[in-house]
Amino acid sequence: REIRDQIVDFDTIQDPHPAGLTLWKEGHEGSLEARFYSIKSFPERFALWQMGSLIGDLMQPALQYSAPFLLTMGVHVLDPNVMKSVVTANHVRATQNARSKMAEVMPDVGKKLQDWTAAANAIDVGSSLVSLYHQLAIFSPPEKAVSAQETANAIWRGRGFQLNADVYMHRQALLASLPMTLSEAFY
């Protein structure tokens, strides 16, 4: 059966535990474990067009998901008026820090100045800034959940990301994974 049929039925029972949600039905053998992950750290450079590489590698079996998965990206366009003042303040602060004597011992000051300069330039030409998230959900039999988790970690680590298990936040993560659920109330 498809995952949508297992989750949507009203008689599906969700049992939360630290690693994820166990989905099952009374009187039916077998269960499904859903585990959810957020991104803990991003690579320094990674364009959205490269996201296709996060669904696995066709040529390397070790970098192929061993269970059904759901990869979701949520994008929230930030208020341009509010962001203009925030970006301006942070850009001024980054410029001051880059010109200070402490800049020599703080290597990330130059990178922060570049980031805030790019954000300020984008706002100056009428662009908007966004806040986004990625959510990964893996659906597997409980006995294969650890293996599926390790495979997902290997795929994402190979692209420079570090995944973070959403421990004790499974239902929120499930809602964040579903399409068309991102709204003001959920953001």
Outline where the language-model segments fall.
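Extended, folded cores of ATP/NTP-driven motor/assembly subunits in large transport
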Residues: 1-186
